[in-house]
Amino acid sequence: MDKYYICKLNKNEHKILKKNPHCIQFFCEVDRIKKSKWPFNKYTIRRSKYTNFYWYKKPRKTGLIQESNLPAISFKDLKREKIFKTTDDIKLNKKVTYEPRKQRPSTTTHLGQLKLFLSTVQFLLYYAPKDKEVHVIYPGSAHGYNIMFLTELFPQCKWHLIDPGNFYKKLYKNPKIVDIQNMLFTDKLVEEKKKTLKDKYKLLISDIRLNPTDEDIDRDNRLQEKWVKILKPNYAQLKWRIPRITKIYKYFDGIDYLQMFAADASTETRLVVKGTGKIKMKEWKYEDDENVMYYFNRILRPSYYKTNVKHKCIDHCHDCVAMIKLLTEYKEKYPKNKFSQQSISNMIETLLKRIQNVKVRLCNDFNKTLKNLR
């Protein structure tokens, strides 16, 4: 059995949210939420005393919070001037600390394949020289459905794919894929790659993660750390999360990039590290990181950002507009690529079709959320 809730809205809020359903949760803090006595259908909705609201359900065992520690919200705070690329871009009030979502709804969208694809595009756009042969070493790359598309977007890249899982069969016939190793990235293989790619421009992308426990996260972080120190890539993009095993966690210093279309309460980011020369280290604090990501996920992601680009399954939320900005940057840097020779709206449509199951899931989620807005 589920619990049913409504989030009360005013007319101005309701009007803008009709076109921006990903932004609904911005207004749905504790003081706006009421528990409903009945499930919602076409009959019970007519009996509701509220005229503007969003309804949703939660598992019966969901706990309650009595008071939010987030800043007071208002309609004028919904709109923001610029997107946030990194965690350093977020200036956080020290009074904001992480607390569980509990009865509050989530209206942002989680699409793992789209998240991974856009993070990879961002990394290659910023760190793969356009006029130089680039070798991309990629442990954790199976099944690799999106890599076929990436080889078209970045033709200067040659790919070394490593994963014990099964790879997409078409990758074996792609001339840009120079090596596929159906195995773990062992110390022996790391040394082999170091030797064969000596004096080559190298990028390391790591997407390893089997289990979400803090012990496993620490183990994966240390594996990535070892690979960077041995391979010495020009840059590495590492799957990054601070384990809660100690208050201060010593790890690489780098640029901590936010992800688009991550899980609604995710603290995972992508850490980009310069692998040549003396590698800088940093003392990370998981509590600080959790607080920043909590504020980002609850307030900044569902805020409204300016764009003139339209598509039937996206709106003005942070994830959607950050994707638009990234594609605009790609179009400017690679104007002659076939993908760039269309409007941004059509670029979005193309990539949604090329990434497995993404368009259906994105549009279904968009329309389902919109349907619950009354």
Protein language model regions, located:
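Conserved acidic E/D residue at the C-terminus of a beta-strand in Rossmann-like folds
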Residues: 161-166
